[in-house]
């Protein structure tokens, strides 16, 4: 994606939030290789580090009442050889268990769209995906957030027929909502959509699967 990382470990994605996060891992049963990851920043740890990664990309003022029971998800990654659905479902199951055990009910995060996505370049894909999801999956206005470095969607082609990345589609199927227009992340050269998922909004099919309710 053309990432330009400034980290203490060359070639590795490391930032100041890592040491404050819980890290969910899925390992291959045979090789024990890590094949799936999530990092989770709890409310208590967010206070310790001074905020969330999402705070660096968006003004989250309107989410202040949610923060006491809100975690931030990030760095979701599944090994290319295991992107058949099983690994991400295992991660989501572990995440649901983590939320319930810790009496948390809200998740936020930045869902990334590469500047080059499905052959569409220069942010037109991200602008088009934003125009799609704002019509069907936009959160109530009281939860809207503002990007600190907005993607200039008004100057991009926003009517291209392009599917969102698989992870974003998965979040939307679960019942997640988009909190506003995308920010541009120059370090990773992506457009980042702010997303929110509340357990109360979990689609009934997945509620039964993950929560047994």
Regions found by a protein language model. Name each.
Residues 15-25, 48, 188-191:
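A short helix-loop-beta-strand connector motif used in the catalytic cores of GNAT acetyltransferases and
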Residues 3-7, 33-37, 105:
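Short secondary-structure capping/junction motifs at helix and strand boundaries
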Residues 1-20:
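An N-terminal domain-cap segment
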Residues 43-177, 182-190, 195:
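Acyl-donor binding region in acyl/amide transferases
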Residues 25, 32-42:
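Conserved beta-strand in the GNAT
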Residues 26-29, 197-198:
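Active-site beta-strand termini and strand-to-loop segments that position acidic
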Residues 194-213:
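Long, continuous compositionally biased terminal/linker segments
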Residues 21, 35-37, 70, 192:
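Extracellular structured ligand-interaction cores
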């Amino acid at each position: 994606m053309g990432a330009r990382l400034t980290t203490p470990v060359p070639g590795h994605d490391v930032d100041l939030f890592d040491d404050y996060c819980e890290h969910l891992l899925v390992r291959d049963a045979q090789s024990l290789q890590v094949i799936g990851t999530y990092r989770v920043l709890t409310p208590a740890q967010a206070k310790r580090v001074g905020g969330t990664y999402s705070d660096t990309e968006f003004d989250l003022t309107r989410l202040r009442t949610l923060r006491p029971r809100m975690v931030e998800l990030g760095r979701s990654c599944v090994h290319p050889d295991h992107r058949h659905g099983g690994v991400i479902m295992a991660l989501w199951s572990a995440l649901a268990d983590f939320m319930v055990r810790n009496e948390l009910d809200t998740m936020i995060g930045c869902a990334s769209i590469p500047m080059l996505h499905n052959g569409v370049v220069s942010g037109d894909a991200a602008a088009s995906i934003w125009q799609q999801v704002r019509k069907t999956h936009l959160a109530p206005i009281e939860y809207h957030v503002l990007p600190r470095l907005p993607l200039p969607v008004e100057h991009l082609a926003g009517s291209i027929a392009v599917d969102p990345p698989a992870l974003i589609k998965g979040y939307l199927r679960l019942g997640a909502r988009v909190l506003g227009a995308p920010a541009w992340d120059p370090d990773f050269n992506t457009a980042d959509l702010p997303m929110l998922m509340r357990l109360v909004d979990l689609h009934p099919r997945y509620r039964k699967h993950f929560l047994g309710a």
